[in-house]
């Protein structure tokens, strides 16, 4: 019998999550049935969306999330022992699957890049950047792109794809270390929003003519300020609103309607799972190709030990990470 460890939601979050909101449970898994496989987690991800999605869980449920896992026992001929897959059993060390919900890594995945990248730049965060920028914003060469949370798993890829497409890129981050990192990646202007005297003036100085595309990961008052500087027919891809996820008070008001109307702005929220099939496969192959060619750089914030899942999650929400937060089981 195999014993699995699982992090569950002990009680719903109020404000920032705390250690007492989670509970680690241990259980024995049953023997495999025909067609099933036993998975062992290698790498697990924590992402901002989990803060909001946890509201839909019942207390006692397993925390949701993807992992890169290895088939350690198999009764499924299509998934022999040793196969590496993407799975979504949540925060758990071992799980049983019939294989229908599993995804093999790209066949061209080389040994030269870590498997954990399938949870980051060549995974859901990279796809989010890809489709949000190219499909929702539809950026073209010569345009100016603004992205916040720009050193995170999504934002850093947004900026690099925008540079590949010939855009000017302005990024906002929360530390001087992150500023230096994005400058190395080739962002045209990067600033620490926590230390500037005026966000409005900083944005104006970075791009006096305004912004064609705004890739929004933050929401709140920050976004209202950016939206006030959008060019005519500007496009806004609403990916996340991490500044509001842990609020206990009322949400801030939205952007001034007159700006949205008279600038004829297009605002569209999106979830990456809209794109499936061939579109998704092409995007993954593009991302992998750009990584292998050195056109997209990546940084991972690796935390060792499954027992540290809650700490990794809470740290990510507070911006402790530079790059994609990954837990190595």
From Swiss-Prot:
List GO terms (cellular component aspect): cytoplasm; extracellular exosome
Which key words are in the record? Acetylation, Cytoplasm, Fatty acid metabolism, Hydroxylation, Lipid metabolism, NADP, Oxidoreductase, Phosphoprotein, Prostaglandin metabolism
State its location(s).
Cytoplasm
Q: Which residues carry this modification: Phosphoserine?
A: 20
List the Pfam families.
Answer: ADH_N_2 (PF16884), ADH_zinc_N (PF00107)
**SUPFAM superfamilies cross-referenced by the UniProt entry:** GroES-like, NAD(P)-binding Rossmann-fold domains
One GO MF annotation is: 15-oxoprostaglandin 13-oxidase [NAD(P)+] activity
Q: Which residues are modified to N6-acetyllysine?
A: 178
Q: Where does the record place the modification Phosphothreonine?
A: 18
NCBIfam families assigned to the protein according to its UniProt record, in alphabetical order: B4_12hDH
Family statement: Belongs to the NADP-dependent oxidoreductase L4BD family.
Q: Subunit notes for this chain?
A: Monomer or homodimer.
Q: Which PANTHER family match?
A: PROSTAGLANDIN REDUCTASE, PROSTAGLANDIN REDUCTASE 1
Q: Would you tell me the protein name for this molecule?
A: Prostaglandin reductase 1
- Species: Homo sapiens (Human)
């Amino acid at each position: 019998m195999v014993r699995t460890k699982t992090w569950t939601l002990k009680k719903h979050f109020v404000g920032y999550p705390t250690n007492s909101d989670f509970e680690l449970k241990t259980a024995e898994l049953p023997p495999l049935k025909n067609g099933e496989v036993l998975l062992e987690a290698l790498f697990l991800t924590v992402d901002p969306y989990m803060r909001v999605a946890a509201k839909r869980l019942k207390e006692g449920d397993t925390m949701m999330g993807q992992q890169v896992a290895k088939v350690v026992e198999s009764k499924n001929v299509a998934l022999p022992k040793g196969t590496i897959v993407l799975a979504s059993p949540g925060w758990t060390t071992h799980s049983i699957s019939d294989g229908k919900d599993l995804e093999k890594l790209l066949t061209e995945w080389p040994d030269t890049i870590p498997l954990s990248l399938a949870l980051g730049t060549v995974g859901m965060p990279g796809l989010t950047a890809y489709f949000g920028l190219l499909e929702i914003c539809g950026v073209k060469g010569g345009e100016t792109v603004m992205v916040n949370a720009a050193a995170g798993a999504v934002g850093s890829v947004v900026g690099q794809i925008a540079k590949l497409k010939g855009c000017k890129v302005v990024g906002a981050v929360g530390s001087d270390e992150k500023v230096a990192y994005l400058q190395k990646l080739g962002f045209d202007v990067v600033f620490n929003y926590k230390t500037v005297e005026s966000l409005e003036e900083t944005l104006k100085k970075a791009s006096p003519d305004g912004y064609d595309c705004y890739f929004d990961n933050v929401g709140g008052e920050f976004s209202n300020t950016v939206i006030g500087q959008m060019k005519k027919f500007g496009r806004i891809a609403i990916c996340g609103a991490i500044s509001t996820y842990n609020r206990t008070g009322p949400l801030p008001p939205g952007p001034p309607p007159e700006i949205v109307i008279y600038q004829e702005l297009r605002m569209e929220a999106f979830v990456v799972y809209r794109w499936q099939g061939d579109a998704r496969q092409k995007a993954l192959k593009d991302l992998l190709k750009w990584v292998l060619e050195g056109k997209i750089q990546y940084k991972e914030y690796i935390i060792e030990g499954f027992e540290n899942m809650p700490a990794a999650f809470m740290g990510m929400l507070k911006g402790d990470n530079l790059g994609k937060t990954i837990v190595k089981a």
